[in-house]
């Protein structure tokens, strides 16, 4: 979607152009995170709005902040985010009334309900952003006691939260992509786009702060994921890492789910509902072998939950919601996880709707610092929805056909198997469809040391179907395949257009040191945004350490990970 300022500049842009040079010349201060002196609020606004995608909106937003020229950049961003929260609240209020309209269909109401949930999540993420910006690590400036490492960790959170808040808005609008959905989308999109553009401006301003990555290319483009240790991002805590790697028999769960009644619960949903809300301690749910036919939602208050199964194909959570039968893609997930710090190991999650039902998600993840170890995800179109925030998958199997790994999280797959299945006649397979909408979002898909191949049902007929590594779902789509084994199922072109020339110049698709019969890049696409990566330093920015702050959080989960190349 083109930015608002495309075309002839408006009067506010003229003001920006006139005052920017003066603002740069007269601003006095030690750093960008302290409060420099600007002669006027207008010059301060021009300086702060430089580099935003929607400068007219930025200038009008900052015009409402009193004494703007005396405030530090974190204070200015907080002011912008607070005004964004007002816009979110107003949009949510309108949705709560509109959903009761007698002119809406059940599918309309479901899509609006998705928007209301996403707006609620957005409010939480914006609140977390202001809390981080007000923390000593950021608000203290370069003269504060916080180290640069602390600034980076905090700013990683800020950039991640803002990136997710923007993603939520596009997910809301995507929910109206059905016959007759355009009339409802038309009612919604003005206010939703307004929120998204305000978040975009905050994201652009936040990128100027120390620790946000703007001061060094070493943190780009996957800033925020973190370093690796012993096979996992460091944000996986040591205790959690042990839980992921220890024999299941050595772990004492907090709850047990069993189909035969031998546990405390017979459904996974009941065990999740009984788990404590907003817990700071890990809560382990052992799901015994069996097929659990249910849709499971791990809500935002269910933090620090862990699912332990009895093995891939033994513990199976299965359902069949799909778009053809009236669901939205967002709501079709067999398992949907929003509660942060979620872990899962040794189980299968499946959407059994089948290829004729089109979009049908097995797992949707919008939980920050979540990790999956030795799991399988089975479906056809849109199997794995890596929706937002930071995620890690290790030694997992993912099966699907069209766009079967998609979304806009910062996600790393290590030592996984990606299996393309037999699609419907005249269809092509696409492993990934990454959904980055803004050049400042710290999101993307990194696939490292994985196997990319055909599933058994496709193997014998793979010459009848084309299979591609990915296609650009959104304008700034970003995906990298590194050090992976690409089988002969991969089409020599490698990548597929979404629609004509859409995003071919703005996407970032890379390949680095892949092997196998499908790894040759000699006949790959010639798009401006595609590259064969030859530099180890460029490739390293897509590793767990630099992309998802994995060194900070994965260290505690017991999921093994590789920090670098």
Predicted feature residues:
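Extracellular secretory-pathway ectodomains and N-terminal mature segments of eukaryotic proteins
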Residues: 27-106
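Sequence contexts marking disulfide-bonded cysteines in secreted/extracellular proteins
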Residues: 48-50, 57-59, 171-173, 417, ...
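Amphipathic, well-ordered alpha-helical segments in soluble domains
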Residues: 54, 61, 87-94, 118-132, ...
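Extended, amphipathic alpha-helical segments that serve as helical scaffolds
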Residues: 70-162, 166-169
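Cleavable N-terminal signal peptides of Sec/SRP-targeted secreted and luminal proteins
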Residues: 8-27
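Sequence-level preference for short, compositionally simple segments enriched
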Residues: 2-6, 30-42, 178-193, 199-565
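Alpha-helical bundle protein-protein interaction modules that mediate dimerization/oligomerization
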Residues: 157, 162, 166-179, 195, ...
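Flavin-dependent oxidoreductase catalytic core characteristic
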Residues: 9-11, 62, 67, 141-142, ...
């Amino acid at each position: 979607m083109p930015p608002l300022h495309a075309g002839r500049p408006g009067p506010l842009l003229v003001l920006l152009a006139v005052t920017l040079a003066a603002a740069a010349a007269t601003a006095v201060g030690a750093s960008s995170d302290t409060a420099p002196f600007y002669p006027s609020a207008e010059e301060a606004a021009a300086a702060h709005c430089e580099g935003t995608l929607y400068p007219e909106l930025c200038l009008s937003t900052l015009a409402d902040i009193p004494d703007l020229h005396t405030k530090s950049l974190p204070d200015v961003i907080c002011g912008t985010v607070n005004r964004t929260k007002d816009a979110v609240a107003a949009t949510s209020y309108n949705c709560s009334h509109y959903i009761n309209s007698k002119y809406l269909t059940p599918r309309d109401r479901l899509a609006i309900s998705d928007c209301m949930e996403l707006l609620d999540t957005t409010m939480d993420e914006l609140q977390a952003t202001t809390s981080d910006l007000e923390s000593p690590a950021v608000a203290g400036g370069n003269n504060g006691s916080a180290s640069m490492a602390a600034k980076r960790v905090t700013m990683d959170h800020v950039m991640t939260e803002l990136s997710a808040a923007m993603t939520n808005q596009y997910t809301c609008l995507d929910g109206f992509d059905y016959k007759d959905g355009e009339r409802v989308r038309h009612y919604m999109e003005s206010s939703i786009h307004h929120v998204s553009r305000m978040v975009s401006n905050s994201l652009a301003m936040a990128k100027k702060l120390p620790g946000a990555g703007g001061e060094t290319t070493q943190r780009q483009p996957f800033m925020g994921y973190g370093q690796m240790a012993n096979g996992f991002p460091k944000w996986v805590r040591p205790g959690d890492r042990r839980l992921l790697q220890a024999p299941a028999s050595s772990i004492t769960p907090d709850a047990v789910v069993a189909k035969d009644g031998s546990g405390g619960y017979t459904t996974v949903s009941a065990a999740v509902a009984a788990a404590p809300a907003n817990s700071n301690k890990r809560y382990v749910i052992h799901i015994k072998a069996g097929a659990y036919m249910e849709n499971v939602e791990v809500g935002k208050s269910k933090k620090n939950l862990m699912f332990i199964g009895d093995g891939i194909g033994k513990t199976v959570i299965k359902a069949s919601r799909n778009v053809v039968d009236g669901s939205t893609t967002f709501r079709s997930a067999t398992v949907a996880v929003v509660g942060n710090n979620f872990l899962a190991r040794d189980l299968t999650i499946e959407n059994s709707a089948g290829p004729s039902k089109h979009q049908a998600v097995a797992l949707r993840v919008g939980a920050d610092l979540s990790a999956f170890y030795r799991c399988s995800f089975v479906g056809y179109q849109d199997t794995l929805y890596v929706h937002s925030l930071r995620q890690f998958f290790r030694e997992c199997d993912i099966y699907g056909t069209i766009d079967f790994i998609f979304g806009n999280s910062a996600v790393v797959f290590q030592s996984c198997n990606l299996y393309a299945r037999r699609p419907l006649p005249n269809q092509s397979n696409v492993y990934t469809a990454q959904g980055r909408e803004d050049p400042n979002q710290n999101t993307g898909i990194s696939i490292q040391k994985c196997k990319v191949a055909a599933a058994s049902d496709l193997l014998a007929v793979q010459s009848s179907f084309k299979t591609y590594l990915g296609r650009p779902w959104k304008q700034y789509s970003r995906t990298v395949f590194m050090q992976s084994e690409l089988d002969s199922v991969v089409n020599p072109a490698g990548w597929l257009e979404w629609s004509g020339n859409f995003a071919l110049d703005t996407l970032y698709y890379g390949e680095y040191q892949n092997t196998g019969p499908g790894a040759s890049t000699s006949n790959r696409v010639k798009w401006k945004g595609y590259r064969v990566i030859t530099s180890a330093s460029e490739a390293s920015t897509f590793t767990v350490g630099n992309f998802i702050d994995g060194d900070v959080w994965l260290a505690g989960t017991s999921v093994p990970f590789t920090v670098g190349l």
